[in-house]
């Protein structure tokens, strides 16, 4: 079975909808936006529906630990779910919650850069830009 992965706030209700249609589907949801504290989240009139949408996923991801913590806190305070630092218990089903910061692993990129197979590709790119740089210098001199 394919993994279904949903990205961002426009689609927060989709995991629950999918869960109703495909109960065994592995569903992930990643929120690129901030998740507010439960005190602020409680101000939403549709707070329960939004949280239930999230909880249709098997895995919910956030960019920072504080956003994940806010989400878990909202599930506990608004829906009364039991939770831990890594997940929320929804009627005996655990929804995992994780932190997945977006960024580049500079050490890993540097490691790949040093591999022998990469050297010719790096040279080709450098050579391509040297010609462009020479043209730029000549254009400025004209």
Task: Indicate residue ranges for each PLM-predicted region.
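Catalytic cores of carbohydrate-active enzymes across secretory and cytosolic contexts
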Residues: 1-142
């Amino acid at each position: 079975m394919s993994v279904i992965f949903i990205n961002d706030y426009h689609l927060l209700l989709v995991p629950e909808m999918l869960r109703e249609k495909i109960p065994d589907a592995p569903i992930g949801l990643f929120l690129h936006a901030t998740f507010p504290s439960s005190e602020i989240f409680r101000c939403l009139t549709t707070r329960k529906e939004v949280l239930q949408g999230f909880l249709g996923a098997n895995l919910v991801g956030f960019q920072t630990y504080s956003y994940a913590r806010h989400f878990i806190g909202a599930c506990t305070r608004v829906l009364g779910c039991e939770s831990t630092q890594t997940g929320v218990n929804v009627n005996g089903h655990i929804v995992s919650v994780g932190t997945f910061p977006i960024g580049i692993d500079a050490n890993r990129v540097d490691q790949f850069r040093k591999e022998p197979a990469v050297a010719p590709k790096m040279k080709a790119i450098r050579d391509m830009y040297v010609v462009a740089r020479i043209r730029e210098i000549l254009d400025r001199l004209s």
